[in-house]
């Protein structure tokens, strides 16, 4: 049963149980909207598996750990980053005066119950066994393979079959049942290489005319990918790196086995100028070619401080690289050319552009991935029920493959086969 994420993007909480009574929760997140949206409550659960460290998958896990003593299984990088993400979640909830079902004591319990688990190592869970596979998407993201002896299940979490500068591509495995995210169902991405080249050309054009480029970026994954991408510029760019992305990069470098070319990331990180004080921010405004900082949707973070100072400079630019949720600062900037900065609507004279560098599988990638698993049953989740899910149902349903969509908080049953499972 989906307690969240069944008919929506984010807010993921999936409860699985079979006839033996073995059970598990996959993710327990929230939608960081205003106000936030939470999944329904789950009771008496001993094990949860967290696919990756984004808020919509892990935000409420401390409550599980503190309330039910739930063990929180995740990859080592995810485990090392949860504290940073959870503390930031608590801080924002306090500032915005939003309700949060856990407190700092619960956070400490969440940290105590983390169980770092490497990729590909089988783990026992009641009558089942399970293991992680690389999901792409961001560093530490994992797909979950569950072997129920007679049925093999694959839960993708967020995944991408296209490699990035810091992640490998997700590889399909054989499964009887696949739960696939469908964020981009019905939509295909432009070629990533073309978007990257367009981004680099735009950065160099702005520098040539004497401007600065502000790149608001998501802290986990996007900031590090952009740092590596900027390395390919023909210019010796002076990059100033601010915000939570800087801290996340340091955590990534503590897990080099989970990062593609960690030596390259470390070299580029050392080359960048790390912003750690107000004085450093003033230096960035005076000297930087590129300022890379959070937040990726311009909802807060140092990015607004920089934008407030660049607002009247038509030579400079703000380059967004991710989906901008309606209601976010980035969405307002793209649609209206203005943004709320500390409660005041401000018109921005800078050039503004969007370079979509999503690390979710697009429609075609989802279809190809699912077909390659050979699954007889497919459940689409983490997707829009009005557009994305119908498009994927139409593309995937065949006489030999059933495709399911599920509402939240409605129990559903999938058949178990008698086929044997192999290691």
Predicted regions and their residues:
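Core dinuclear metal-dependent hydrolase active-site scaffold
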Residues: 1-43, 116-168, 282-283, 290, ...
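Pre-active-site segment of Zn-dependent metallo-hydrolases
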Residues: 6-11, 15-70, 74-114, 161-167, ...
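Active-site neighborhood of phospho(di)ester-bond hydrolases with catalytic His/Asp-centered motifs
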Residues: 26-29, 45-56, 60-61, 72-76, ...
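Cap/insert and terminal regions of metallo-dependent hydrolase folds
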Residues: 162-242, 317, 340-404
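Hard-cation-handling environments
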Residues: 200-321, 326, 381
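Short, flexible loop segments at boundaries between secondary-structure elements
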Residues: 243-256, 318-357, 402-422
